[in-house]
């Protein structure tokens, strides 16, 4: 869900002659000079944070911001950061000694991220005696909160996982790490293609806090036990995805349900490099559910109760669910039927054509340059069938498994 951009630090925009004269008359330094000075200050701030040098970190803070900023510094103490840096993108001189800066913050969790996670920050600064100080630091217009801005982060390391939580008991974080550790080999068995083989899980304190991490109202995710964020079609330098747990919905599940959730989300992490805008949601979500239920012994009636009710009531779906059917915040029963139908489509492929063909089909769809024709081409080339015949086979499969 995240899209990142990288670029050299440059001042964007065009200033009018009047504005330039006004700044010059006030004795303001040239914009490029201010950008360099601000970048240097932020570089020092980043080095101090990585070194856990609180005194050096505080040097660039205005007294009005210092208490809040030093709290965030403390909140990050347990996070195993491998890198942390800022790139100044734009400096807006709002007065003789004032500036507002748009900067890209990039950070990497050591041992998990091959590339930095990036997010935009907006910083207000004041200049005193030739030095710049940060007076405010907030997310950019389209940026979400970061976990450490919500409280002290507790880190629990599993054998194949890192769980970062705020406001959660340690035993709960350890249980999530154990489930994530079990998920990784299960996913590797279902998805034999190379992937990182590890997962980062974020556990915020509440549903609303989860919404803050996703830049959306928490109510949008009510009833959703977890989601995964990351770059679609991330390259080898893309950061690891983040699995974000909804502590309320996840907490009401039993051990089996919790394991299914984490295996499902870990599957998204594993398949990310093969997932692209050409991949329909039914395939990405259906495959993740197929991988999660694989080998558990659960029947279709147990795993697809909403769709079973519909089929038994004579409401057999006419077509595979479209992307809109998977939108959060709508009819919960309809959403469940979409997931269940997608899972059974992938189960059909695995049973009729084989598991290797299912993963080959997934990769073939994701490799297509666009959504148009992606599924049709993969159905023909990998499975030797047509959309019409596959849909008919899927509907028959639903009737046989759920009727």
Predicted regions and their residues:
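Juxtacatalytic substrate-recognition/specificity segment
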Residues: 157-280, 371-374
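Bacterial N-terminal signal peptides that target proteins for export
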Residues: 2-14
